[in-house]
Amino acid sequence: MSKRQFGLIYISSYQARLFIVDLKKLSIIEQLSSAQFVQGGKKFEVYENELPRLTDALIGFKRKIAEYGIDNYKVYGNRQLLDKISARYLADQIKVRTGLEIEWLNGAQIAYYKIIAGMALPQFSELTDDEFTYLLSMGSAMLNLTLFKGQHYLSTWNFALGPEEIEEMAAMTRDTPSDPIDIIGDYISRKLVSFKTIEKPTGKARIIIQHVSGRGEQSLRPQEKARVIDLKQFAGVYSDFREAPDQYLMEKYELDTDSLARMKPTIVLINQLVKIIKPHMMTLTQSSAITGLMIQEAARLKYRPDEYSTIVLTATKNIARRYESGGKHSNLSNKFALHIFDRLAHAGMVDRRDRQLLEIAARLHDIGNFVNFHNHYEHAAYIVGANQIIGLSDRENEMLLSILKHQDITNLNADEREYRHLDPALQVRVAKLAAILRLANSLDASRKQKISKIVVSIKDEQMLITVTSKRDLTLERWVFEKNVNLAEAVFGMKIAMKQKRGK
């Protein structure tokens, strides 16, 4: 068994799939799929109704993984159509029946892995800084549209347009005398109304359409992982779907009735986006969130560089800008917080994996001022809860909200209550990150950036933060003393601040 082999099981509301992957070559050695789950009713009911079939498939996947002698395997599930409680129950039933532990992926994570997959395309490395690229992906519950400048991530927009809406549209148009394409077009146009009003970059643009080989999208299926098609060719496809009878479409594009019903809205959607974006090129690719998961595992094991951490931080900065935050105070708090964290990490007192979460909290802790200065930390948590950070898991989102709520020094007695709902192991991690951010915020309490530099030393169960400033720090000292108790409690040492007069 090669250590570079990886078993990836992915469960969606359509079927379960196993991929045996060579992480070094990033190629699929073998792929197995369950029978497609019976659709009908609400999509979230599919998991429950098809549990016996899903269980049988997973047991078969375990046997195949054992045949390869693979120890490194993971099970992921698409949670977009499940609430958290139902997902927890289903995960427990799967574990009892198969021994497999499933990691559910929320919509923000799935969007993140789709972006990674798009960035890994060979064509992506050819993009120049004067070119903009839109990455379009249809998901089980959301449509994701991501914008890049050159090879750099800029932003992602999410639209509530998934299979359920598409199937409802299909049912609605079956018995109407009006042209179904016109009705579908009006519905999709309504979904895109906000995007139409957003100021979009001018200049050369292309559009990449992901996962075109998925269920119900055979008419756009490429023979390779990615290919460029002429926009006139797509215009011909759109014309067919607008003018031709269903029987002709099913024969020409090899579609069944259900696939055709799902395909029509997809074609209309792409056509509307082409009109808005006006790309000079269209690329079709089979890449999907599954591709992104493979790439992530390859990066984790150092088979390829991890080039994607900037996506999460860029998305964070976008939220900060939207709510008129992210200025000098936010940048300085972030700088000080990461410096303190790194010294504590060197001493083995924090988990290095939490560094990114601390940076996100540092950049977003003041966005609640957009709503109201009073209780602005509560407002910050509310805003973040309503704007899921791309790439963060449900657990990481819960931790982030708790860290933000912890910053209210006027309500220090509420500390324990803010994270009591978390798992015990997470409570300590949250308290540590919240304590670090409090200390960092204290050092710019006046919002005047009086301190230019800090040096953190840890010795004999004491932490000394030496700050460089030639200005009066009375306010900073006072706020520091108000905040230091939590840090001393969670790190088990005395913490002091010392001023060094700078030039």
Q: What residue ranges belong to the model's regions?
A:
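Post-signal peptide N-terminal segment of secreted/secretory-pathway proteins
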Residues: 71-73, 85
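Gly/Thr-rich phosphate-binding beta-strand-loop-beta motif of the actin/hexokinase/Hsp70
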Residues: 1-29, 122-159, 211
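Low-complexity, glycine/alanine/valine/leucine- and proline-rich hydrophobic stretches
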Residues: 446, 450-495
